[in-house]
Each structure stands twice: as C-alpha cells, then as structure tokens.
Amino acid sequence: MERGSPGSSKSVSTFTPDSMSTYVSNCVVCGRLTSLFNYGAHSCSACGSFLRRTLASSKFLDDCKYSGNCFENFKRAIHFECKFCRLHKCVQKGMLDLSRYTHLERLICELSEFDSKRETLFLTMTVSNGFKAEELMWQSSVSLVKKPPHLVFNSHDWGFMNQVTIIDFLKKLEFSKFLSSQDLRSFLKCTHFTQVILKSAVISYNANQNYMSFPNKIDIFPETVTEGTSISVNLQNRIRCRLVNRLIELKVTHEEMLLLCAIAFSNPAIPELSENGRTLLNSYQNVYRSALFQYCSTAYQRNGPSRFNDLLFLLHVVTKTHDDIKKYFTLFQFFQPTEQPSQVHQDVIEFIN
C-alpha cells in the first residue's frame, strides 16, 4: 500500500433526480446542504472530490493550524480550508474507501513489491556523508547512496541500515501522509523496531537458517559480545532463535508474513497517538486482519481460524524478543562502553527512542 495509490475507480456519486428533490440534508463533513451520496456517506460533491484527490496524492497533509476541530461544527465547517481536519472528518464518517485492498491477490502483490523494494535498499545502499538522525522523522525520504564495493558492513552497520530503510519504508505507506507530524513521529518511533525484528527473522528464515543473522551470515551481535562477556549466552540465543524457530515450526508462508507485518505496522494502540491517528490506523489494520483471515480460511479451510490465531501470536513472540533486545542493549552499554557503534549510529538510536 504505497503512497500515491489511486482511489477507487467506482463512481463517486450515486443519486437519482427523485432523491435530489426528496432527500436534501447537511453534508456529514462540511455541513453544506446536499442531496449527494459519496464514498458511503451523505456528503457534497466538493468533499467527495477532495477525498478522491487526497487519496490519489503522494503529498503529506500539512498539520492543522488551528485547534484541530475545524470540521466539528456540524452545521458549518469553522475553517473550511483546513485539509487535515477535512480528511479526518471524512475518516470519522466512514468515507475512507479501502475497497481496492479487499482483493486478496492484488493486496499481497502490492505488499510484496513494496517489501522487495525495501529489501533491495537495505542490501545495496548506505546513507550519504551528510546524513543526520533527524532526517528519519522528516516527511521526505531518507537520502541514500549506492554502497561502494569496498565497503564491508559489520553488525552495527547492518543494524543501522535495517532501521534506516525500515523507517523510510514506513514513511511511504499510504496512511503515513495522513498523520499529523506528531503522530508520524510517534508512529515511526513505536513501530519501526517491530518491523526490524520481523524483517530480520524473515530474511534468516528464507535463507533456511534457524537463527537470526544479517546478510552473509554476519552475527547480529558484535564479535566482542560473542567472544565472551557478562551478557548471558541464553539471552543472546533467545534473541537469535526464538522467533525464527517459531516461523519454522509454523511453516509460515511468504503471504502470511507480508500480511502479519502489515497488521503490525498498522497498530492503532501506539502510545501518544491522537484519536485521529488511532481511527486512521485502525481502518487500515482491519483491512489487513480481514485479508489474513481470508487467506487462512482459503488455505486451511476448517483450520483457518486456529491458523489465524497462531500467526497473530507471533506478534507476542516479537514483543518478547524486543524486550530481550532492550535488556541486551543495557548490558552492552554497561559492560562494553568502548565497543559502542559509531556516533551517527548512536545518534539514530537516541533520536528514535
């Protein structure tokens, strides 16, 4: 679901001359009198056209310049020019048309293509010399350059690029452009590491490994950690193996992982997310959950519901892995203060946490 995906091709308005004369009411978005019905709601032509253009645009919406309730007055919008509040009023009224994502095969194809682009960037690119950590929270894409052939990444470098390319990937999702700048920051900070864990596990799983590693089987931990420290081997192995082994046990398919990752990145229960942000993400997550359930029901028939629950439980395994990684970072900083990653890597870690 990349930014700039066009809106539904179905007709924007459906009405008859008789209904025009017998059913005139206020537009549920702006309050104007109208007899039209757009995107599943009683709404005027202007609001229907606005929503269609907004869904088709790749541009981020500017934050509301006022109090965030420009379209709360039902009888008339307070600040009609505020695109941000207008869009979210459309969402509140159920006008966000996600029907184009209900075609399972097409949705999986889009997610697969999008994920493939992200993985290519991860494997072949690096940040430019002038890179600054705050770029990650900007609405624009992160500036990346081709990785020189002589540049060999260590575990810190791969971990850094994994985070950078995943944050860039998340900013390109369709719904990201509808979030306020504050919600976008909260979304990126709280969501990206779940994706880091999932994507790292998937790459290793697809390589027929039973442990998590970076490309070329580079360990996810620095050599100084694996050579023997006060960081327990049991903790290291839980991080490396728990999620990958569960993927192996379940024999998770490519399609299932794509949809599970989508459910994870559209999580509406992010702390500090506004009500508008929660409503928006919930709309998208419902689409992904329905798609995964449909896939499971088709592929596993009577066992579809239990398969669906088994896959969702993987997100709890991700959470446990994340908790273990937090413990590891604390121990690594305490026991090996001289082996920390480069300054730009540390800047990113501090900035996004």
Curated annotation (Swiss-Prot):
Annotated protein name in UniProt: Nuclear hormone receptor family member nhr-27
GO MF term set: DNA-binding transcription factor activity; sequence-specific DNA binding; zinc ion binding
InterPro entries associated with the record: NHR-like_dom_sf, Nucl_hrmn_rcpt_lig-bd, Znf_hrmn_rcpt, Znf_NHR/GATA
Keyword terms of this UniProt record: DNA-binding, Metal-binding, Nucleus, Receptor, Transcription, Transcription regulation, Zinc, Zinc-finger
Residues annotated as transmembrane: none
PANTHER family: NR LBD DOMAIN-CONTAINING PROTEIN-RELATED, NUCLEAR HORMONE RECEPTOR FAMILY-RELATED-RELATED
Protein purpose: Ligand-activated transcription factor. Involved in lifespan extension in a manner dependent upon mitochondrial function.
Keyword DNA-binding tagged: yes
Record family assignment: Belongs to the nuclear hormone receptor family.
A Pfam family matched in the record: Hormone_recep
DNA-binding region per Swiss-Prot/TrEMBL record: 24-102
Phenotype reported upon loss of the gene: RNAi-mediated knockdown in a Rieske iron-sulfur protein isp-1 mutant background reduces life-span extension, causes a mild reduction in fertility, and reduces induction of expression of glutathione S-transferase gst-4.
Gene3D superfamilies: Erythroid Transcription Factor GATA-1, subunit A, Retinoid X Receptor
Signal peptide interval: none
Gene (UniProt): nhr-27
GO biological process: determination of adult lifespan
Any one GO CC term of the record: nucleus
Domain NR LBD: 119-351
Main location: nucleus
Alphabetical list of PROSITE patterns matching this protein: NR_LBD, NUCLEAR_REC_DBD_2
Renumbered zinc finger spans (NR C4-type): 27-47, 64-85
Region (AF-2): 340-351
